[in-house]
A protein has these predicted regions:
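Hydrophobic ligand-binding cavity/cleft-lining segments
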Residues: 1-43, 133, 139-143
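Generic structural detector for well-ordered beta-strands
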Residues: 8-12, 39, 53-55, 65, ...
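A short, structured loop/turn motif at beta-sheet edges
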Residues: 12-16, 43, 67-72, 91-100
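Short beta-strand segments that buttress and anchor functional surface loops
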Residues: 50-57, 75-81
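A generic structural motif
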Residues: 59-61, 71-72
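Short, surface-exposed coil-to-beta transition loops
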Residues: 4-6, 60-64, 84-89
Length: 143
């Protein structure tokens, strides 16, 4: 079973600025209400193989690992727990003078359906909060 949530929105900020916010994962708690903490487990630029410990309200700490990264455009990371793997995708596409952000959260495994039933509403709310945090922060940067 696979469950996926996806959200996209236009942002009145250059794609480069939006990208810099997306990959600065340790800054997310200052921008996004649905993140309590993000701690990188390695140093240097975000890259395939980078890992972070993420804490979100009402969820257990999770260890995320970057599985794909296309500089300036997208990155994906995954976390796994018994019976379920969760993948988060972050895509920035230029749109005129601004950008479009697309966020996805995909869960698969034997417990994916149960997670969708129990946590689907919270997942969608957190995804919306994440999008709003990125949009608000990107649009508030003087430029």
């Amino acid at each position: 079973m696979t469950a996926e949530d996806r959200i996209a929105t236009a942002v009145d900020a250059p794609a480069e600025e939006v990208w810099s916010l997306l990959i600065d994962v340790e800054r997310w708690p200052a921008m996004i209400e649905s993140y309590e903490s993000v701690r990188r487990l390695d140093s240097g630029p975000l890259r395939v193989g980078s890992r972070a410990i993420v804490k979100q309200p009402r969820l257990p700490r999770a260890r995320w690992k970057v599985t794909q990264l296309q500089p300036g455009r997208s990155f994906a990371w995954e976390t796994a727990s018994p019976g379920i793997t969760t993948a988060g995708g972050h895509l920035v596409e230029p749109r005129g003078q601004g950008a479009t952000i697309t966020l996805t959260l995909r869960q698969h495994g034997p417990l994916a359906r149960l997670a969708q039933v129990l946590l689907g509403r919270r997942t969608r709310r957190y995804l919306s909060m994440e999008m709003e945090g990125f949009r608000r922060t990107a649009e508030s940067v003087p430029g």
